[in-house]
Structures are given as structure tokens and as C-alpha cells.
Amino acid sequence: MKVVEVKHPLVRHKIGLMREGDISTKRFRELAAEVGSLLTYEATADFETEKVTIEGWNGPVEVEQIKGKKVTVVPILRAGLGMMDGVLEHVPSARISVVGIYRDEETLEPVPYFEKLASNMHERIALVVDPMLATGGSMISTIDLLKERGCTSIKALVLVAAPEGIAALEKAHPDIELYTASIDKCLNENGYILPGLGDAGDKIFGTK
């Protein structure tokens, strides 16, 4: 599995700001979208382009445009919604596929509860977004579903990843790509990433 920890200074700075314990909901939400945007920039670097001729201000001009497979952005509910707008800045014509999965607080196992995927998944590149890759369960379940629907080109974008989650994801889906702003130290006994960001969903939506 290709794992990319994006070490751009802007990414490191913004993730550092997100770690503040008393960060406001507004600021956390803004930063989640901003880092999501920067991760998308990295994740789409291998997209192929083709030359086309358009009508410019002074006549025909040859330009490059993205070619090949269409894109679908797949936020994992609910926290993944916080990154979605940042991703769409770069791929505004992408279709949105939604997957609802929550983690059982006792077993730490993923529990699916909703799905609505774009059509023709076999023709699409999926950008799966979720702020935290902790145990990896939710991401693995989502990618299982995407593959069942025929999707073969999948990239996962997460703000923070735990080594345990990366190992689990690689074991389950060695053919995908993972882009993260930070590979953190470990999981604690409750399955939270350390140092992590806290509960990203609660911070994005202002709930507890």
C-alpha cells in the first residue's frame, strides 16, 4: 500500500493548530477543510491530462484538462463531511458518494448504517475522506463496499493516522493509496489516536 505523509510546512502548521485543546468549532472546521484541500492536491498529482483546444480571449488556444476516470468523493459520515468542501475545491465536478459508519464505543468495531453511492463506480476514482484513521475499521468497511460496487481506483485521505490503523488498512487493502497529514504515535486503550485531535466529529459539529 502506498502511504504518503504530506510534510508540507502549511500542512504541518495547520495540523498543529488543530491539536489545540480549546480550539473553537469554527476554527477546527475551517482547518479540517483546508488540510483536506492540501491532501487532495497531493493525492491528485498523478491524474493524467490531455490537450484540448478551447476558444480563448484572442482565438483558439490549446490547454490541458484532466482526462480519464471520473472522480467521486466519499465522505464517511459524519466527520468526513468536514473535509469534503476542501476536496471539492480541486475537483468541483466530482460526484459525492456517502457512507455512514459509526464505531461501537465498547467493541471499537465499525457499524454501517447508510450508503448512497454514485452510479458507475467501476468508472470512477474514489477519494475517501475521514479525519481519523484509528483502528482502521471504518475505512476498511467503506473500501470493502466500494470494491463490491466495482470501484478499483481508491485513495484514502485522512488528517491523522495511527500506525495500528495503517497496518490494518494495508493488510485488508494493499492496493489502495493513503494520504495523511500526520502519522501519530499510537492508539490508547479506548482506541483514540495519541496525540491525535480528540473527537474530530464532535469538534467539527460542535457536539459532545
Swiss-Prot record:
Needed cofactors, names only, are: Mg(2+)
Cofactor note (record):
Binds 1 Mg(2+) ion per subunit. The magnesium is bound as Mg-PRPP.
One GO term under biological process is: UMP salvage
E.C. no: 2.4.2.9
Query: Which reaction does this enzyme catalyse, per its entry?
Result: UMP + diphosphate = 5-phospho-alpha-D-ribose 1-diphosphate + uracil
Q: Give the pathway annotation.
A: Pyrimidine metabolism; UMP biosynthesis via salvage pathway; UMP from uracil: step 1/1
- Pfam families from the UniProt entry: UPRTase
Q: What does this protein do?
A: Catalyzes the conversion of uracil and 5-phospho-alpha-D-ribose 1-diphosphate (PRPP) to UMP and diphosphate.
Protein known as: Uracil phosphoribosyltransferase
